[in-house]
Amino acid sequence: MSPEDVRERYEQVRDEVGPDVTVVAATKYVSLAELGVLAEAGVGVVGENRAQDLETKHARYGDAFRWHFIGHLQSRKARQVSDLSELVHSLDSESAAKRLTVPALVQVNLSGEESKSGLPPERLEAFLETCPVEIRGLSTMPPFAEDPEESRPYFRTLRELAERFGLRELSMGTSQDYRVAAEEGATYVRVGTTLYGGSHR
């Protein structure tokens, strides 16, 4: 993984999704040493999945990036995540919301898969009415599919939900379907494999 390769791929993704979409580099499988390559490549926003990894990486490269949290948010880690990131993409519990002090996107489970985090859509309205933190939008993770078009109905449904509640930000789309997500109104896409190649997810 060289800075030149990452920069080329990063710029390609940015060109594909357009100026209104923020490309978040997913760093779950990026080592501490490799983060320096991302910084050298000009990556601006990174998304971390685990609070402990966020703490470790932020301690070394805190000023090099804007930090987002994109993994499942445990209530007991919410304050730690708040101290280190500017936006949480994955809020889905009242207990975590009470401890969070940075803006968030509510994660919605549109597929009904038990393996996926997120609120069921029928609970979204009540959650938004009582949520004590600033909610800027919604996020979702559709079922994995080889064909990106299979993700489109989920992205469209999320956009319609956001419009219903007057929310502007949409975090949806990963390496295999970010182009479709952008077409359906994503304002954040999370990419890993696309930036780093086959050895990273």
Q: What is each residue range found by the language model?
A:
Residues 1-176, 182-184:
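Conserved alpha/beta-domain cores
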Residues 66-67, 189-191:
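Short alpha-helix boundary/capping motifs
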Residues 3, 179-183, 190-200:
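Expand to "…catalyze enediolate/carbanion chemistry for C-C bond making/breaking, isomerization
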